[in-house]
Amino acid sequence: SNVGEKLTAQAQIGELPLDVPMPPSFDEAHAARHISPAYARNASRHCPDKIGFHPLCFCCGVEHEEDGLHVTAAPLRNNEIVAAAWKTQLHWADEAGNVPARFLWTALDCPGQFAFYAGGIRTGMLGQLAARIEHPVPAGDPCVVTGWRIGVQGQRPYAGPAVFDQRGRLCAYAK
């Protein structure tokens, strides 16, 4: 899609082979939330005196108290992964009663950056996202969202985020 003459988004269909690590439990992710950079004061270079890594972000920003997704990932397993206990909301439901795909894609956005941050690497904003939705997530169901570092090619860091349902089933993943 374009804004004026500037390309702002592009999509294509393709394969997405990715080894997705097993998630922690919802309770384990929830217990770690207090160490998430999403709650750190002055964690953002661009929003001084605010709380959070990206305070205004719809996905991870705590400034979106009423309308955000609250995917506040915290480091686990010796900083090898980050995870967030994500409480989806009933009022988000699409016609089938599921979390809309646009919210799943959004939930996959920030955990990759949080994974690099947990490893002591500060990255920029997301530049590219390839995702696959395997199973719908019923609106209102608790989920675990994870992120892990895949590697760096040149100056581009690559991460893998994933969404798991309350049974631990992989519902969506990205790179």
Regions found by a protein language model. Give the residues of each.
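Core beta-strand residues in small-molecule sensory/regulatory alpha/beta domains
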Residues: 2-4, 162-165
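A structural microfeature
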Residues: 8-11, 172-174
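Active-site helix/loop of acyl-thioester processing domains in fatty-acid/polyketide metabolism
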Residues: 79-81, 90, 99-124
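Short, acidic/polar linear motifs in exposed loop/turn regions
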Residues: 151-153, 167
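Short aromatic-glycine-enriched beta-strand elements
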Residues: 155-161
